[in-house]
Structure formats: C-alpha cells, structure tokens
Amino acid sequence: MNRKGTGFSLSVSIIMGAFLAAGTAIAKDPDPSRLLISRNAEFNKEILRVSDNVYTAVGYAVSPVSMIVGPQGIVIVDAGLDVASSREIRADFRRIVDKPVKAIIFTHGHPDHTHGASAFMDSTDVQVWAREGFPHEQHALETAGILIQKKRGKKQAGFALSPKHRINNGIAKAFWPSRKGGIFSADHKVNPTHIFNSERQKLSVAGLDLELVAATGETDDGLYIWFPAEHVVFAGDNFYKSWPNLYALRGTPYRDIRGWANVIGMIMQEDAVALVGGHTRPIIGKREVNQTLANYRDAILFLFDKTVEGINKGMTPNQLVDYVVLPEKYKNLDYLRPYYGNPEWAIRAIFSGYLGWFDGNATNLFPLSDAQEAQRIVKLAGSEDALADLIVGAINEKDYQWAAMLCDYLLVVDPKNKTVMLRKADALTALAQDKLTTTARNYYLSSAIELRKQASALASE
C-alpha cells in the first residue's frame, strides 16, 4: 500500500473506539448555533481506516464512501453525491491501494449515495448492486405525477441560503449543487447491473465474501452490508449520528418507523465491531456499537409505542406532540439529538401514516377553508389593522410562532401586503435561530427569503 506523497488526511491506524464513540451524553445546550458549530468536527475531510481492509472517506461530500479491499480488487459502498467529489475520493483511495474496482453497492437509492458512481467505474465489468425496487422513493412520487417535493427539497437542504446561514446540514457539511440541472444532478447516471430480492444475499466478489441484507427503514429499497471476515457492518441511512429522519420535510411516502427500529435490531445481531453509517463518522468497538444501536433502536420504539398509546386514547396529532416526551437518557445522547430529523415530525408521521388526515375531532370533518377561517379571525380581531397590531405585539413578545400564524391569516385576506410578508419573514428567521434541527432551520430561512423577494417585487411594481 502506497501512502507516500498523499494530499489527504489518513488515519493510518485503526480508529480508536474512544475517539469515535458516539455514546457520550452531553448537557443540553440552550444555544443551537453553538452546538452546530461544534458539530463541524464530525465532518472533517479525511479517510479513516475502519478495520484492516475497510476505509471510509468522510467530509468529501454529503455522505461517506467506503472501500473494502480484497485480494483481487476493491468494493465500493455507496458512491457519493457527485462525480467531482467522488473522483477525488477515488484518487485518494488509489493512493492507499492501487487495485481495480470490482463492485459498487448502493445501500439505497438516494442521490447523495448514488450520483457519483461513474467515478468508480474502472471498467465496464464493474458489478453494481442494489435491492429490488431501487430507487423506490423517487418512483413512487413520480408515478403519481407529484413534483412539489423537488421545490420543498431545495428548502429542506437550504440551497438558497448563503454559507453564513448554513452552519452545516446536521449530518454533513453544507454543500450546494455544482450544476444547474437540478438537485444532486449526476453527470453520468450509473444503473444497477445486479438486483437482489431475497432477505439475505451472499456475494463473492474481488476475493471477498459479503452479505447484503434487506433493510427497509429510511427507504423501502434499503439494505445493509455485513462483512463477516472483519465484523464490519455498513448500515446505510438506517443509522447516522442524529435523531433519524423518520419524516422528511420535502415529502415522502410513510417510512415504516417500527420496521426501521426492527432493522436496527437486526444490525445489532451481527455483533459488529465497527459500524459505518450513511452519514457522519464510523463507530468503532463492539461495546460502543452495541450500546449506540441499542439506544437508537429503543428511542425509536419508545416514541412509536408512546404515540400509539396516545392514538388509542383518542389524541390528535397536536395533542400527541405534547404527550410523547423522550426520556432524558435519550434526549441527552449526542447521536440522538435532533440535528437532522425531529421527534415531533415522527409523531405526526405515525398518526397520518396509519390513520390518514382526519384527526378524529368531528369539528374537522369539513373544516373551513383558509379564506373562510382568515375572514373570521380578522372579524374576531376587529379589523385587518387590529390583526396587524397583534402581529407586531407577538413579535415584540418574541412569540414568533403565533406571529407567523397571524401573518398567514392576514396574507390570505390581503395576499399582497408587503409589510405582513416582511413581518412573517422576520418571525420565521427568529424561529430558525431557536432550532437545532438543520432541516427546519433551512426551511424557515428559505421561506423567509422567498417572502422578502416577493415583497421586494411588489414594491417595484
């Protein structure tokens, strides 16, 4: 293995478990921005040696890319966000070992794990493995003709924001698309050449024996990879160091939350000594891996079971988010902090995923339209001017959620009210600063930018 003259950071010895262990409980920090800034250390750009023959590149793009070295070549696990960053990873992998890529394995079909694949196509004989249904999420929405998730996805990711307003993305550095073709555009799309449709598929390639395991969690096409010779598991997006994204703001089909927790239990049964997640740094050491996965699984199951308990008591989604409170032992674990996903969204997703839109309150069988409700709120306030005064009062009292809601009423009855647009933008900006969940921050701030642009356009008419 040639490590001379490399321009990248390589941990030449196996990562110490104490360094990467994610099981450290930390005190609750009232300053989300400070927590996110300290989080940046998780995304330092380097190649980590996970075991004797496993290397993981972190910090190059949104998701890690791993290399398993075999006697006859290498296997790539996930291919990164884009061809440019993946080419850099390929070059740095080649400095470690100059062997041909024999296979690429996609843990699921999200673009940040697949769109860099052409950088690893050393020949036309490279096997590209994925699970049946790949990529399920995109197919389900596109088949229905639903496109709005693309616009919402840009807000969730914060692509319209400046570096000043994106500290990171919770589970990755803040990246922006390098091409105008769309979110996570691929220069050369690489499709799977091999699909497996069983619960567990044994794969012999490059002189390596691997096992691909069906693992429906974040996506229906998800899988994890078990490398028994070195007891390494590659979990894909079913694990990363954050409260999991059990519901994505861009809009997705229901993610089987109980099934997700069960997959974590399956991964635990492998008894791995190293865990490579779909984002963030690997976890090394049997004890650390088992403890982390157990807490991850148990926290998800607690939330699911408590939500079902509340549902069976007749609670509405709004009532459930007050009823379901995670125990402190989970809330204070850094790898369960809501950097990316948020427990409240998961609670609402469970309700709608099983019971649909109707919350059980007869009043809501045929609710007022937005216009009808807004007109009545204005009447209740006394006038549009009186409602505008209430908005100012709410902002002055730092009641930003209420201020934004009041703005919505007034914008329904007066959709070109520039002043209210700007006040809602201010309220959303303030809400963003108070949230740790990066996807929420991004969505708030992106929406605020839209409102300010709309107000500016109206002012110039």
Predicted regions located by residue number:
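Active-site metal-binding motif and surrounding structural segment of the metallo-beta-lactamase
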Residues: 42, 71-73, 84-130, 197
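Conserved beta-strand hairpin/beta-sheet module of binuclear metal-dependent hydrolase folds
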Residues: 44-97, 224-227, 231-237
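Accessory terminal helices/loops
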Residues: 28-37, 146-150, 160-164, 175-177, ...
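Divalent metal-coordination and catalytic microenvironments
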Residues: 53, 68, 78, 93, ...
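Bacterial N-terminal signal peptides that target proteins for export
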Residues: 1-13
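Bacterial N-terminal signal peptides
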Residues: 11-21
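Metallo-beta-lactamase
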Residues: 28-34, 49, 73-75, 81-83, 137-214, 259-271, ...
